[in-house]
């Protein structure tokens, strides 16, 4: 297993991290939303076996959060790492959307420490920051809270996860002495949200960068379109789509570790085998060209020609325009698009949804693709809700 230093910290992290959002369920996964449903119990025996196998094979970074598996994920992880605490790095996140007053920061954090059966976490993140939530929680004293838990030892390091445009990302990076950040990054989303620009910016400021969705929630590895598979098959080297995707992420020296939300032992075994062969900058120019062709082929399937540049942002009404258009495109590009429906209907804040568009037209004035965004947002809401 390859290990890399996480930013300015003293932590050496495995290049493969274990994301605990998609653990196996007792009765199987019927819908994408099951991973947030407290009535869908985790299959503890299988999940703990997977985590123990990962630890035994060198994985040391484990990521969870308050809402994962309807609040069960942190407890399961705490149980799984009992007796292994000195071998692992635990990261969890503050449910900032549930914070209504300053005392809530401590209340939720203490509850999370109890679930994790630990007196401290290695990394505590503000979960899912965007422009609106960032300014709101700052006013509630989030940064003073982070200072406090670092000083009293309940959190060794602090960071944030992020879902918004790159200028907001840079603002947040420069606003506090963060140890690390967590961003979405894969070969299809190279310029989406924080993207490559944000990745390099954070690393240049000394932050460790952890990548989520390196396989885009499994969409880059399952249900591969025939025209994409043909490109993979044309390569001089035989690799699974998962290996291509992970190697692409690891080809960026700014990345410390890539999280994979694994739900079966087979996935754990496969990803660990890939990670054991990992090295920094592992792709040749010819291999990068193969990935570029795959990306181009996927993009030709786009229904809305949005590049994710975010020139349309910020929306004065709070709509996350690039995210809405991306979710809409996902429903056409990938065979399994249920995650797009789940995110729109269950994860986006009301103001972020396409339905919150006031049709002011300000976004269209700034769109370099000259998209009819107001009309597109109507189609987005109709397709993702059936209304």
Task: Please provide the spans of the model-predicted regions.
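Structural preference for beta-strand elements that scaffold enzyme active sites
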Residues: 5, 13-17, 60-61, 87-91, ...
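A general structural detector for well-ordered alpha-helical segments in enzyme core domains, enriched
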Residues: 2, 46-50, 73-80, 108-112, ...
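Alpha-helix-loop-beta-strand connector modules within alpha/beta enzyme cores
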Residues: 74-92, 144-152, 204
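Conserved residues at the C-terminal ends of beta-strands
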Residues: 19, 65-68, 124-127, 161, ...
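Structured C-terminal cap/extension of enzyme domains
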Residues: 55, 60, 79, 197-387
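Glycine/proline-rich, positively charged
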Residues: 27, 32-34, 97-212, 223-229, ...
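Structural motif
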Residues: 53, 57, 115-116, 176, ...
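N-terminal binding-site loop/beta-alpha segment at the start of enzyme catalytic domains
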Residues: 1-88
């Amino acid at each position: 297993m390859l290990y890399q230093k996480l930013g300015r910290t003293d932590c050496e992290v495995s290049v493969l991290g274990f994301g605990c959002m998609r653990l196996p369920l007792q009765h199987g996964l019927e819908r994408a939303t099951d991973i947030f449903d407290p009535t869908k119990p985790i299959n503890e025996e299988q999940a703990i076996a997977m985590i123990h196998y990962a630890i035994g094979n060198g994985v040391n970074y484990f990521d969870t959060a308050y809402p994962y598996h309807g609040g069960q994920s942190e407890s399961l992880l705490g149980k799984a790492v009992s007796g292994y605490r000195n071998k692992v790095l635990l990261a969890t996140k503050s449910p900032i959307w549930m914070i209504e007053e300053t005392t809530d920061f401590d209340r939720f954090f203490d509850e999370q420490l109890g679930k994790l059966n630990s007196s401290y976490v290695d990394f505590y993140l503000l979960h899912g920051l965007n422009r609106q939530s960032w300014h709101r929680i700052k006013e509630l004293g989030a940064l003073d809270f982070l200072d406090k838990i670092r000083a009293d030892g309940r959190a060794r390091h602090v960071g944030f996860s992020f879902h918004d445009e790159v200028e907001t990302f840079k603002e947040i990076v420069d606003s506090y002495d963060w140890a690390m950040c967590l961003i979405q990054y894969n070969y299809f989303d190279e310029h989406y949200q924080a993207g490559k620009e944000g990745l390099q910016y954070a690393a240049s400021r000394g932050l460790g960068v952890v990548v989520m969705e390196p396989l885009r929630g499994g969409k880059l590895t399952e249900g591969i379109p025939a025209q994409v598979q043909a490109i993979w098959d044309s390569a001089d080297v035989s690799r699974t789509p998962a290996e291509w995707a992970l190697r692409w992420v690891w080809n960026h020296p700014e990345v410390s570790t890539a999280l994979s939300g694994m739900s079966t032992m087979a996935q754990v075994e496969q990803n660990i085998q890939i990670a054991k062969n990992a090295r920094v900058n592992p792709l040749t120019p010819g291999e990068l060209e193969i990935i570029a062709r795959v990306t181009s082929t996927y993009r030709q399937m786009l229904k809305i020609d949005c590049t994710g540049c975010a020139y349309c942002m910020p929306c004065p009404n709070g709509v996350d325009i690039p995210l809405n258009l991306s979710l809409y495109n996902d429903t056409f590009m990938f065979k399994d698009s249920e995650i797009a429906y789940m995110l729109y209907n269950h994860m986006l804040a009301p103001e972020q949804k396409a339905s919150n568009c006031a049709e002011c037209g300000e976004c269209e004035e700034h769109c370099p693709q000259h998209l009819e965004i107001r009309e597109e947002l109507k189609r987005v809401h109709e397709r993702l809700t059936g209304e």
